[in-house]
Amino acid sequence: MTISTLSSSYGNAQDVPAEDSDRHGSIEPGSEKAANAVERSGIPILEVKNLCHRYPHLDANTLEEINLKVYKGERVAVLGANGAGKSTLFKHLNGILKPLSGEVLVKGEKITKKNVRMCRETVGIVFQDPDDQVLAPSVEEDIAFGPINMGLSSEEVEKRVKEALKMVGLEGFEERAPHHLSGGQKKLVAIAGILAMRPEVIVLDEPTAGLDPLSSARFLELIMKMNKELGITLLLSTHDVDVVPYFAERVFVLHHGKLEADGIPEEIFSDPELLRKAHLRLPRIAEIFEMLQQEGVDINIKITAEKARDEILRVMDSRFQTFRMG
């Protein structure tokens, strides 16, 4: 099916209800700017103030007085055990859910009924289960859905679909039926659908869940590329602590709907008690270093393989020098 046929099938954005046309999240052009060093000053691209949320069937709040800021170009991990409130928080970031109290600001503007479409054109969301998001009969139709409903020309829609497919490595999949794809491939289609709308922020809910180690690594490489080459601000939720050191510049820790910590990965993972309180653990590499500390070895906890190597070499050199002097 051609893009022009797709356009006539879907109609214009003005003819489609907001809740339908925004099912992918959305975007505003601007992703062509190269990623620059993040400056945590000025107006945050996302800000959450005193956010509380409660589902109707529950007696307690799912989110309790959440306050956080995310700045343009950052890569942020939201770390928490299952049930910590990560998905609920993410659904507030472009107005899918409404707060019980508090507010969410996108580029300094509070999300309201009047501007929710603009907010969804800035913040795109990739859901944990791609079957909740990839719904069209073909890959091409699914990726074209958002751009068509932005009112773009057939030529521009086709261009964006091709660019998005190339970015996620699915060239040649245009006519494939999504239900014939693997789980990992469906997640890539979901991301392509968001990329085609060129958002400034992409929120990914447990993106590596259900993926094998190789697919998970490739997925992380892709989203790092999106950040570095397109300048897209990224928020990623996960309970996989081994993923975080290789992705995040900053980490939020959620526990029972409360924000327990906000810091760089080295700070967060140097506090084992914080992680245990949040029903998490140290990354495997850091666990080894913690055990060495408990054995009396004078060694600093490291969280990536490269830094662990450097620290081990430092300790070995120090002991060698001590041995020579003795």
UniProtKB/Swiss-Prot annotation:
Its EC number is 7.-.-.-. Residues 46-281 form the ABC transporter domain. Residues 1-34 are annotated as: Disordered. Signal peptide: none annotated. Its main location: membrane. It is a peripheral membrane protein. GO terms for molecular function: ATP binding; ATP hydrolysis activity; ATPase-coupled transmembrane transporter activity. Residues 1-12 have a biased composition (Polar residues). Keywords: ATP-binding, Cell membrane, Membrane, Nucleotide-binding, Translocase, Transport. GO terms for cellular component: ATP-binding cassette (ABC) transporter complex. InterPro entries: AAA+_ATPase, ABC_transporter-like_ATP-bd, ABC_transporter-like_CS, ABC_transpr_CbiO/EcfA_su, Co_trans_ATP-bd, ECF_ABC_transporter_ATP-bd, P-loop_NTPase. ATP binds at residues 80-87. It is an enzyme of class 7 (translocase). GO terms for biological process: cobalt ion transport. It is found in: Cell membrane. It holds the Pfam family ABC_tran. It comes from the Archaea. Probably part of an ABC transporter complex. Responsible for energy coupling to the transport system. Belongs to the ABC transporter superfamily. This is Putative ABC transporter ATP-binding protein MA_4020. It comes from Methanosarcina acetivorans (strain ATCC 35395 / DSM 2834 / JCM 12185 / C2A).
